[in-house]
Structure formats: C-alpha cells, structure tokens
C-alpha cells in the first residue's frame, strides 16, 4: 500500500472520480475490490503496539490484510493523551487511519459535547489521519463545525448513525442519509440490528435506493447474532 498512516492526513478530500466512491487517506471506497477496515481498540500504548503488530501479520488481499485502520479512541485509557497515542499508532500502522470516538448514545463511552468536538478537530488537524467518524445526529452546528474543520485539514469525514435496538424504515434510512449528505460528509454510514427477514429486505432496498440517489458512498451495516441466523434461514 502506497499510503501510510503518517501521510494520510495530507491527502485531499475527494468523493472519488466515480459516483458512489470516496477517498479516505488514498484508499478509494466503492472502487475495485472490497476494502478491509480493521479496528484498533487499545487501552494502552503496549496494546496499540500489540494490535498493530497483529494487523501486520494478517493475510488477505493486501500485504497486511487490511486497507484502513479504524482507531476507536473511546477504548483508550483516560490517563493517556489521545494525540500522543495517535503518534504511536501512526508510527506503527503503515495504513491510513480512520479515527472514531463512539459516544455512549451510540454504544461507546460518555464524553462532553465540547470535548467530543475538540478531540475530533485536534485529531483531524494532526496530519496523522485520513478520515474521522462523526456521529451525524448530535448538535447540528457542532457536526457542521467538525466536518468543516476536517475538510479544511484535508481529512475525509464518515458521518454515522447507530441503532442497536431496531431497523429503521427505508424512508427513515434515506432521510438520515440525506441529512448526512447535506452536512457535507464524504461517506454515509448507518448501522442497525435486524431481527427478521423483513428487516434485511428493508436494508437491501434502502441500500439500493441510496446508491441511486446519493453521490456519496453509502454503507449500511447489520449487527448482532440474529443477522447470521436470519441469513442462514434465507
């Protein structure tokens, strides 16, 4: 892979040369083969080193078995400075970094709204990441401030929404994607918890419609053990 974590933040933000594509740290989503994103959920510096070493040993379609590292900052110990941890991660992971802080509202850790904003902006401006994840349905002005700040730093933005209790109707999914698109995100992401075949069909329909409506790259993720059992029954 030509893009390294340490240079990813210097790449320009782009929606890709083809409708439905997006460039994150030099890796184009929606073009060519399926891209592999591997999470780092380290609490300590030692765990950062250990997890990135494990990623490097993976087999797969690229030399390291992955295309992008998703750094889950909400797993990091409060005693460790996030930017120092990012330096360590960028030095050891020769891949573009997608930086994510998942808040308690969407299955992660509690954080004050101002601290969430300041952290994402600092990470985006660090020159060490290719993209940041922004929870799209927080305060609208804060979301736009984060997206604008990231773009000014040359960093792509993944707008996300998570519902771990149900599957929204297709109309709601498309409305949420529309709001993410209007806010200027480069990638639109929605994750939910299907409980039936009907739920899976809703997600397939919404995915198909989104691919025809939006120029941005849109992703829908299904979580939970029920998804696997439903697919087996199909």
PLM regions with names:
Residues 136-234:
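Catalytic alpha/beta core domains of metabolic enzymes, predominantly
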């Amino acid at each position: 892979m030509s893009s390294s974590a340490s240079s990813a933040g210097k790449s320009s933000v782009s929606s890709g040369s083809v409708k439905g594509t997006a460039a994150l740290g030099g890796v184009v989503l929606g073009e060519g083969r399926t891209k592999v994103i591997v999470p780092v959920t380290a609490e300590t510096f030692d765990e950062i080193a250990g997890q990135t070493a494990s990623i490097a040993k993976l087999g797969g379609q690229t030399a390291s078995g992955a295309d992008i590292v998703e750094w889950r900052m909400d797993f990091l110990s409060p005693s460790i400075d996030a930017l120092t941890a990012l330096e360590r991660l960028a030095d050891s992971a020769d891949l573009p970094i997608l930086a994510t802080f998942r808040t308690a509202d969407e299955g992660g850790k509690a954080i004050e709204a101002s601290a969430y904003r300041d952290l994402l902006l600092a990470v985006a401006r660090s020159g060490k990441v290719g993209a940041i994840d922004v929870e799209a349905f927080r305060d609208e002005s804060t979301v736009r401030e984060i997206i604008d700040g990231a773009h000014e730093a040359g960093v792509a933005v993944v707008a996300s929404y998570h519902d771990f209790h149900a599957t929204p109707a297709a109309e709601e999914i498309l409305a949420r994607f529309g709001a993410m698109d209007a806010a200027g995100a480069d990638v639109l992401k929605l994750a939910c918890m299907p409980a039936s075949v009907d739920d899976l069909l809703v997600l397939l329909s919404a995915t198909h419609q989104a691919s025809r409506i939006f120029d941005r790259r849109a992703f829908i993720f299904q979580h939970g053990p029920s998804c696997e059992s439903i697919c087996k029954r199909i």
